[in-house]
Amino acid sequence: MATKFQEGGQLEAQRSRLGPPKMYKVVLLNDDYTPMDFVITVLQRFFSLDTEQATRIMLKVHNEGRGVCGVFPRDIAATKVEQVSAFARQHQHPLACIMEEN
């Protein structure tokens, strides 16, 4: 957005410079109850991953306790966390999804 300043009777336009937005990781956390197939479905549905990518992340969640689904600006990451959490609750799974600053 341009801001106008008056110096000595002249108006000059000065542009604000914005840096890139902070990015946030969306992370799935392992639990002992959510089926692996459901985790793959979540990854495909909400993160547009193919079966191979979704399976790789699901196995990382299963084996290491957590897996990064993607990195997004804050508002998109928060939306994805809410969508995944609501979908898991709707299907009665305790799958946890969080966001962390990248």
Curated annotation (Swiss-Prot):
Biological process (GO), any one: proteolysis
Pfam families cross-referenced by the UniProt entry: ClpS
Source superkingdom: Bacteria
Coiled coil: none
InterPro entries listed in its UniProt record: ClpS, ClpS_core, Ribosomal_bL12_C/ClpS-like
Function: Involved in the modulation of the specificity of the ClpAP-mediated ATP-dependent protein degradation.
NCBIfam families, per database record: PRK00033.1-5 (NF000672)
Family, as annotated: Belongs to the ClpS family.
Subunit field text: Binds to the N-terminal domain of the chaperone ClpA.
Name the UniProt record assigns to this protein: ATP-dependent Clp protease adapter protein ClpS
Protein source organism: Dechloromonas aromatica (strain RCB)
Gene, per the UniProt record: clpS
